[in-house]
Amino acid sequence: MIAVVDLGIGNLANVRKALGGVITSDPYAIEGAEKIVLPGVGNFGAVMEKLEPLRGVIIDAINDGKPLLGICLGLQLLFEGSEESPGKPGLGVFRGNVVRFQGVRVPHIGWNQVWQRKECPLFEGIKDGAYFYFVHSYYALPEEDVTVGVTDYESKGAKVVFTSAVCRDNVYAVQFHPEKSGRNGLRLLENFRRL
């Protein structure tokens, strides 16, 4: 069973439909799941507050080797903190912080390419430079070698190259929304389901 963590925000139906999972905020269901999906939209601090009662269950699942997929804000929550909510710690699964885009139009909304930097089972059968759908104002700056995909965001004469996918052991996360990314997104979710 795949547990799609319900934090009371965002439309989780498309993620659940693509994965055949169960939408839940029950710690026992999350603990008993074979895989966990941590989706998210909204404010880093507000969502971390809702996630706090599940922190231990999620960290234990990761330490037990269960595959976890973070989506959009779910990727950001896996880092140590965010400029969006100073002083509010993230899950700290990955070292590094989340910063706001500077010099480019915010938010970054629309289709953009993901360039694969390392092999990762999430991207099996997906062409390098494939397009995915993004909606975000912040991005992660990892302080360790976990980046498996990057994206170039150009606007207003400026360019930011940011980490759009990370992977280490059984923890995977993407800044884009695979559930809104057509065939490429469905393939990525299927790859996660088959891990």
From Swiss-Prot:
Keyword Cytoplasm (UniProt): yes
Record Pfam families: GATase
Catalytic activity, as annotated: 5-[(5-phospho-1-deoxy-D-ribulos-1-ylimino)methylamino]-1-(5-phospho-beta-D-ribosyl)imidazole-4-carboxamide + L-glutamine = D-erythro-1-(imidazol-4-yl)glycerol 3-phosphate + 5-amino-1-(5-phospho-beta-D-ribosyl)imidazole-4-carboxamide + L-glutamate + H(+); L-glutamine + H2O = L-glutamate + NH4(+)
Residues in Glutamine amidotransferase type-1 domain copies: 1-195
One GO cellular component term: cytoplasm
Source taxon at top rank: Archaea
Location of this chain's protein in the cell: Cytoplasm
Pathway involvement of the protein, from the record: Amino-acid biosynthesis; L-histidine biosynthesis; L-histidine from 5-phospho-alpha-D-ribose 1-diphosphate: step 5/9
Single GO BP term: L-histidine biosynthetic process
A GO molecular-function descriptor: glutaminase activity
EC number: 4.3.2.10, 3.5.1.2
Keywords on record: Amino-acid biosynthesis, Cytoplasm, Glutamine amidotransferase, Histidine biosynthesis, Hydrolase, Lyase
Subunit structure: Heterodimer of HisH and HisF.
PANTHER family linked to this entry: IMIDAZOLE GLYCEROL PHOSPHATE SYNTHASE SUBUNIT HISH (PTHR42701:SF1)
Protein name in the entry: Imidazole glycerol phosphate synthase subunit HisH
Organism (species): Thermococcus kodakarensis (strain ATCC BAA-918 / JCM 12380 / KOD1)
